Design a protein with these regions (language model features):
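Conserved beta-loop-beta element that borders a ligand/cofactor-binding pocket
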Residues: 1-17
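Conserved catalytic-core motifs of eukaryotic protein kinase domains, centered on the activation segment
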Residues: 18-21, 43-44
Length: 170
């Protein structure tokens, strides 16, 4: 359309700073910091591939600069992990008890595995994620520890009130 040089990027689950607190990793961090239950769907055996947000940004930049027009690039983190293992890792990093983990009824149609094959971007553009999951999760936890006001305003309802004021009844 409009003769624009378009490439497509598809990615696995991102994590890192500013990750909205409704998602698995930030939700578990915020709840653990507040000693609230850590709700895990089903038995927690659903698998996700995790990609640190800065690695995803680097991949997008590389695709924009060096990608071929009309190509599709899958950007994956090589970090396939079960949700329960992610939650236990967060609990460990925060020095909290696994007793906070609460198993809840799984969502209908919940994907058992969500991951993509990033072989093409590795082969064609030489991209590989630079952040090891263990390092990325620690940076993410540190960010949430140092930016409580940001995420606490969101989970307190202040964000929802702002959103309704700005966009409600329009």
């Amino acid at each position: 359309t409009y003769k624009l040089p378009i490439s497509i990027s598809r990615c696995s689950n991102n994590y890192g700073p500013y990750h909205f607190p409704e998602k698995l990793i930030p939700l578990m961090i915020a709840n653990a910091l507040n000693d609230k239950p850590l709700p895990v769907y089903g038995e927690g055996i659903n698998v996700r591939d995790w990609l640190y947000v800065e690695d995803h940004c680097a991949a997008i930049d590389l695709i924009i600069r060096n990608g071929k027009e009309a190509e599709v690039y899958n950007v994956g983190g090589h970090n396939e992990m079960r949700n329960i293992d992610i939650v236990k890792l967060i609990v460990k990093h925060l020095g909290k008890s696994e007793d906070l983990i609460t198993f809840v009824t799984d969502r209908a149609g919940h994907d058992m595995r969500y991951a993509i094959d990033p072989t093409k971007i590795h082969h064609d553009l030489g991209w590989l994620p630079q952040t090891k999951f263990e390092d990325g999760i620690q940076k993410t936890i540190d960010w949430y520890l140092n930016n409580r006001e940001w995420w606490e305003n969101i989970i307190s309802g202040e964000y929802q009130q702002y959103y309704e004021k700005m966009y409600g009844n329009r």
